[in-house]
Amino acid sequence: MEPWSFEPKGRFDEHTVESRALRGNPLGDPHERPLWVYVPPGYDDEPGARYPSVYAIQGLTGQLDMWRNRSPFRRNFPELADDLFARGDAPPVIVVWVDCWTSLGGSQFLDSPGTGDYLTYLCDEV
């Protein structure tokens, strides 16, 4: 697959979340964080419809923007998910990609006096 040939059937939106939980964290990392949201095909056609959500979090050394990386001739996860929902092979869901990267070089998904309240951010604010 050529990287320039992907045209999503659903919609990808990029947001910025201002986090109270991460404001003033011990590492001085940003409290404004990127948040990506994918809505499946047909989402805008039924404004009252409700969809389950899936939260995609990367491993310790992963960064949010790494989800867009691809291996040669293979689709990345956002493209695979879009294709799966467009074909109807899975029930439609909203997919949310969350950034919890720290200046220590890894993502955190817990509340810690050393890094900040990432679990609170993830579970209560996102």
PLM region spans:
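Non-catalytic cap/lid and distal C-terminal segments of serine-dependent acyl enzymes
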Residues: 1-125
